[in-house]
């Protein structure tokens, strides 16, 4: 591998005023066991770990003091989220509680508008983001690929966005490639992390090839037959997609073009003519 390729793989993810060595963020819910979560984290080396305050109770496998102690031991920055909130006020309150519990200004902002699709509430989301940003939070809003919504979130002070690929937990991959690619094209300087709906590593590679800055995963890893191996696969896929983007892929063509050029006559024609 050349020096150029090595530096491309090592290029950092920049969110707000911080730099991260990985472009993969990992959720911490629904793993078969705390040990499988710990092993998956070590396998993929994520930039951040998302944690829902509402799940941190002693009665859940991923809850309690032991879980929090394990996260601290891993040394990976924690990104609390407001999962399960259905209003701006509810999300605001939970974010404030998360700041106290996890001692961080980072928040993955979720305000759900529909129980069936878990689609973000496009009206409440900017309102909640604006209030939290005024309070000094570094807000990463879970949103759709809607360009107008994304611009509104930027207008209220968000400096990075997390559009979905598909509804949470479906594993369908990008259901609106046109919308995601258009969003990347129209917001070229904004950090964009695809959050929700990715199911297999090739989905991560695809969005990274489109120019997205990172991916956030949970169910695709936690519910895999081998979460540790899948975490490693997603890490490699994310790097591959990023490197492919930086390498400048060849343009698509409508007609075939020979990869081996033919210059002049075949050598046996030349020998025959000279005889």
Curated annotation (Swiss-Prot):
GO terms for biological process: thiamine diphosphate biosynthetic process. One of its GO terms (molecular function) is thiazole synthase activity. Its EC number is 2.8.1.10. The active site is at 108 (schiff-base intermediate with dxp). Keywords: Cytoplasm, Schiff base, Thiamine biosynthesis, Transferase. The keyword Transferase applies. CDD domains: ThiG. It comes from the Bacteria. It is found in: Cytoplasm. Pfam families: ThiG. 1-deoxy-D-xylulose 5-phosphate binds at residues 169, 196-197, 218-219. Gene3D superfamilies: Aldolase class I. It catalyses: [ThiS sulfur-carrier protein]-C-terminal-Gly-aminoethanethioate + 2-iminoacetate + 1-deoxy-D-xylulose 5-phosphate = [ThiS sulfur-carrier protein]-C-terminal Gly-Gly + 2-[(2R,5Z)-2-carboxy-4-methylthiazol-5(2H)-ylidene]ethyl phosphate + 2 H2O + H(+). Signal peptide: none annotated. InterPro entries: Aldolase_TIM, Thiazole_synthase_ThiG, ThiG. The keyword Glycosyltransferase does not apply. Pathway: Cofactor biosynthesis; thiamine diphosphate biosynthesis. GO terms for cellular component: cytoplasm. Belongs to the ThiG family. Catalyzes the rearrangement of 1-deoxy-D-xylulose 5-phosphate (DXP) to produce the thiazole phosphate moiety of thiamine. Sulfur is provided by the thiocarboxylate moiety of the carrier protein ThiS. In vitro, sulfur can be provided by H(2)S. Homotetramer. Forms heterodimers with either ThiH or ThiS. PANTHER family: THIAZOLE SYNTHASE. This is Thiazole synthase.
């Amino acid at each position: 591998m050349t020096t150029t390729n090595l530096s491309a793989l090592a290029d950092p993810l920049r969110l707000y005023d911080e730099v991260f060595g990985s472009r993969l963020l990992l959720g911490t819910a629904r793993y078969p066991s705390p040990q499988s979560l710990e092993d998956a984290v070590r396998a993929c080396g994520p930039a951040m770990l998302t944690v829902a305050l509402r799940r941190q109770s002693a009665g859940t496998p991923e809850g309690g003091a032991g879980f929090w102690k394990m996260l601290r031991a891993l040394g990976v920055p924690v990104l609390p989220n407001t999962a399960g909130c259905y209003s701006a006020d509810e999300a605001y309150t939970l974010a404030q509680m998360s700041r106290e519990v996890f001692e961080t200004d980072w928040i993955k902002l979720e305000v759900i508008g529909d129980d069936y699709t878990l689609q973000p509430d496009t009206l409440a989301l900017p309102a909640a983001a604006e209030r939290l940003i005024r309070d000094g939070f570094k807000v990463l809003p879970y949103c759709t690929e809607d360009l107008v919504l994304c611009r509104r979130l930027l207008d209220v002070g968000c400096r990075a966005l997390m559009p979905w690929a598909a509804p949470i937990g479906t594993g369908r991959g990008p259901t609106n490639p046109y919308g995601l690619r258009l969003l990347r094209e129209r917001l070229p300087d904004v950090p964009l992390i695809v959050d929700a709906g990715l199911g297999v590593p090739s989905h991560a590679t695809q969005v990274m090839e489109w120019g997205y800055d990172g991916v956030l995963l949970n169910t695709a890893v936690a519910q895999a037959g081998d979460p540790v191996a899948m975490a490693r696969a997603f890490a490699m896929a994310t790097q591959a997609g990023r490197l492919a983007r930086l390498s400048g892929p060849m343009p698509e063509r409508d007609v075939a073009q020979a990869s081996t050029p033919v210059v002049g006559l075949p050598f046996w024609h030349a020998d025959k003519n000279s005889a």
